[in-house]
A protein has these predicted regions:
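Glycine/Thr-rich phosphate-binding loops that ligate phosphate moieties of nucleotide
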Residues: 1-226
Length: 226
């Protein structure tokens, strides 16, 4: 349910394996929402989407999004649950609610992986992320820190920069890993919002309960077909 890989810090005298949580539907959900909101004239940017989400309170007024619409999920033991939107009310919910619920659904799905890592004894205290993708959003960073109950440290890097540094390290352009990454700058540190910790625990628990029910129904239907 998690991926193990040879880490860039691996050495013959100091073995290092990395572990990776992968949720196929996270990034594509947010890009799907962006495409959805750009069906009519007038472009909606990710910055505008993030601003809309910031205006909505925790829990998106009851709206729930499940970002599992991009094929089977290893985290869910290879199940193809499909994406869904739950508790949608046409009178209460608008685009901002959908964006906020999408953010929360992405974070909740990643937190499933964090729960799994915890069972393997992996310490979950601090997260380091690049200033890119969804971590560009202060709202996303705050929700992520609160739901996972971790300190989130944002550095001035992204996937392309990291890949280039790793390749240069492998080509022995740098003397060691410390030299390869010493120029990275910490640009933000986000702590869990303690005022929302209990609320988000309840929201995550409710979200997970619906997911567990969907998985149970999926498994039951599969068994009936055998």
């Amino acid at each position: 349910r998690i991926n193990t890989f040879l880490h860039v810090n691996d050495r013959s005298i100091s073995k290092r394996n990395g572990i990776l949580i992968c949720v196929n539907g996270t990034g594509i959900l947010y890009s799907w929402l962006k495409r959805l909101f750009n069906q009519t004239p007038g472009s909606v940017s990710y910055e505008q989407m993030n601003a809309h989400a910031q205006q909505i309170s925790a829990g998106a007024d009851g709206l729930q999004v499940y970002p599992f619409g991009n094929g089977s999920e290893r985290l869910l033991e290879g199940r193809h649950v499909q994406a869904s939107i739950e508790q949608l009310d046409f009178n209460r919910h608008h685009a901002g609610h959908l964006i906020r619920a999408g953010m929360e659904g992405i974070i909740f799905s990643l937190n499933l992986g964090f729960d799994l890592l915890g069972t393997y004894g992996v310490p979950l205290q601090s997260i380091r992320a690049g200033h890119s993708n969804m971590f560009l959003s202060p709202t996303f960073r705050s929700i992520f820190a609160t739901v996972t109950n971790t300190e989130v440290r944002i550095f001035d890097t992204d996937g392309a920069d990291g890949a280039a540094r790793g390749a240069a390290l492998g080509a022995e352009f740098y003397d060691d890993a410390s030299q390869a990454f010493e120029s990275l700058k910490l640009i933000d540190t986000v702590e869990p919002d303690r005022a929302l910790t209990n609320q988000y625990f309840d929201l995550y628990s409710g979200w997970k309960e619906v997911l567990d029910t969907a998985i149970h129904e999926l498994d039951r239907n599969h068994t009936n077909l055998l």
